[in-house]
């Protein structure tokens, strides 16, 4: 009789819930075997669910693949709402039908997983571009226009010219066909990839600013108006990276 360890190793090779080998081990009365079967089936179902989710997030891309459009750039931004720091946009071109496990809207992914998924995107992407507009630009032209500028810069920094743009809730003044998608980071893998790249990039910038301007907890709050950040403003005042057109900074001038 095979040991539980040996059976576990065999179960790991099964990837189909309809595989006939399940029946062979289902009759094994050992608790360890039954536990291993349940766990393996759970893992397979989880993988199937993830595959289905990723497939659903390729709907917009697949419509373009049918038209032989393969160089599709997903574009997203991070940092519209914070009181401090830049707005950062990313443009990402993934290979056709590329599925990166657990890729989703950055807001739906635990922060501890951001770096791993970010690295997977960099490893698999055909091209990645970043655009950054600082707080001065945001104050000069407003956050909406600064976001557009950051997105256009991100596209211009791609090493490959895209054939089509999938953009999260924006239309850009660029001579490239584009599709505006509401909640794009939750509905397109290309845009989700851009959201992760933008998020990790901006978090690193804000972490560096935390060292330069201690007392505001920028590495924790990324410039958003948390209690700790607002207390820092009251205690230490405004830094050069604060957005002077945003309240409560505007009223502190």
UniProtKB/Swiss-Prot annotation:
The keyword Zinc does not apply. Keywords: Cytoplasm, Endonuclease, Hydrolase, Manganese, Metal-binding, Nuclease. Pfam families: RNase_HII. It comes from the Bacteria. It catalyses: Endonucleolytic cleavage to 5'-phosphomonoester. It is an enzyme of class 3 (hydrolase). GO terms for biological process: DNA replication, removal of RNA primer; mismatch repair. Residues 70-253 form the RNase H type-2 domain. Transmembrane segments: none annotated. One of its GO terms (cellular component) is ribonuclease H2 complex. Its EC number is 3.1.26.4. One of its GO terms (molecular function) is RNA binding. Its cofactor is Mn(2+); Mg(2+). It is found in: Cytoplasm. A divalent metal cation binds at residues 76-77, 168. Manganese or magnesium. Binds 1 divalent metal ion per monomer in the absence of substrate. May bind a second metal ion after substrate binding. Belongs to the RNase HII family. Endonuclease that specifically degrades the RNA of RNA-DNA hybrids. This is Ribonuclease HII. The gene is rnhB.
